[in-house]
Regions:
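Internal intein/HINT superfamily modules and their associated LAGLIDADG
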Residues: 1-247
């Protein structure tokens, strides 16, 4: 018998967690290899601590949807690693406005369900959180964009997360992830459509992105927030066309 209160050798714990056998077979193997007779309750305890890693399929969604989700996470998401009695929990959260962003939350939920994890929406005061637990997704998501540049869909996701409609433009502000702000500014410069940027007194940087710039760079095609400008222009003109083409 293993002495009461004494932790089992690491090799024994690894065998319990990895061997796909009956409790009786595990008991016999441990006794044969280490001369320790362990109770079934001990096997049950360590088996509950096995990593519950569920597969995700990033190929199940379009490249544009995945880029959009990454941009949204970079702007308005966070991830935490919680250690509980039964192992680690890899939590991803996207925080959105309860009044203004239900369509964004709906798109976010659709993408997550298609990839594989089971997300849920949690009310938090005036906000809603899209929350999901997934080890694979936890490591796939980064707050900083790729140094190789970002796509129109990625910029659209960031705008949907941290942008605001300002008449016929989007104002985007970002202070916590300077690489995101820099990456979006670089995207517009590379598209030959530079945007106005400035800093407030507390070094909070802001960016002003006109509607025509959003349209020219195709960001408009993917941003739910930017599409509100199109709808506003349509109401102002009485239609979604100005007679010379689509707004």
């Amino acid at each position: 018998m293993s002495p009461v209160g004494k932790r089992l050798p690491k090799e024994v714990i690894t065998l319990i967690k990895t061997q796909k056998s009956s409790y009786k077979e595990i008991q016999d193997n441990v006794e044969r290899l280490w001369k320790i007779r362990i109770p079934k309750s001990t096997i049950s305890y360590y088996r509950r601590q096995r990593a519950r890693t569920k597969a995700i399929d990033l190929e199940a969604v379009s490249r544009e949807d995945w880029d959009w989700f990454q941009g949204l996470f970079s702007a308005d998401g966070n991830k935490t690693l919680n250690r509980g009695n039964y192992g680690k929990h890899y939590i991803i959260r996207i925080s959105l406005s309860m009044n203004d962003d239900p369509a964004i939350a709906k798109k976010c939920m659709r993408i997550l369900r298609t990839i594989g994890p089971k997300p849920m929406i949690v009310p938090c005061g005036n906000c809603i959180q899209v929350r999901v637990s997934s080890k694979n997704l936890y490591f796939a998501l980064k707050k900083q964009p790729s140094s190789d540049g970002v796509s129109p869909a990625y910029v659209a996701g960031a705008i949907d997360g941290d942008g605001t409609v300002d008449h016929h433009a989007i104002q985007f502000g970002q202070s916590r992830v300077p690489e995101l702000f820099d990456g979006i500014a670089l995207f517009f410069r590379r598209s030959s459509t530079p945007v106005s940027t400035w800093s407030t007194k507390n070094n909070y940087r802001r960016m002003y992105i006109p509607y025509q710039t959003l349209k020219k760079t195709l960001v408009l095609s993917f941003s739910l927030r930017a599409q509100r400008i199109r709808q506003s222009l349509g109401r102002e003109r009485g239609d979604y066309s100005d007679g010379a083409g689509e707004i």
